[in-house]
Amino acid sequence: MKRKVFITVKTYPTLSKKYDELVCTAGILDDGSWVRIYPLPFRKLDYEKRYKKYQWIEFELEKNTSDMRPETYRVVNCATIKTIDDPIGTENYWRKRKEIIFQRNKIYKNLSELIDLAHENKLSLAVFKPKHLISFHVEATEREWSSDKLALLQGKVQQLSFFQTQEELRKEFSVVDKLPYKFFYKFSDEEGKESRLMIEDWEIGALYWNCLKKEKGNEQAALG
């Protein structure tokens, strides 16, 4: 079925043994409900199909039966992806964005309630508003993608090299730089329950690389 989705979530790319490079994308359907679009090889899309956050897009969707989370769908054919107008801006304190996201969606403030609903498989996407933002954390992690995933990609390149040009192979199998750090928020909910959540948004990766470039490769200066 063809649906319109208002994109609100786009993660930094990761490598998958099954699907190569992936970006987890989520947003609000035109009926106000949440949707997760998975898998979606974002960087392989033609430039005009590369959507931005807070932009309406249209494509053919069907339920992803390999993922039991209720909101998960997959794109039937990436060629059907169509961006609609420009991304919605931040004018009037994000008024238009808020109308689309909050009009039909509950704002959760109790984390235990959300966790219980997730355990019952009633939802896996929601709007959550912390009571307090306590701190921001940075942790070092592996600096390179795992060798087994890279080996699988290389094997696919070798299999396809007889049928595709080098330019086509570069487009399909170029690997995004791996972030050498993980970023977290620590926060509390309305009951005072403290939690830590990893930040996986595309923007956190872009911010790190931009700061690193600005600081001429000095990682500690880039991390602030």
Feature-to-residue mapping (PLM):
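Surface-exposed beta-strand edges and their flanking turn/coil or helix-capping segments
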Residues: 40, 49-53, 72-74, 88, ...
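OB-fold single-stranded nucleic acid-binding module
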Residues: 62-76
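Short edge-strand/loop segments of extracellular domains
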Residues: 77-83
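Nucleic-acid-binding small beta-barrel platforms of the OB/S1 family
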Residues: 85-224
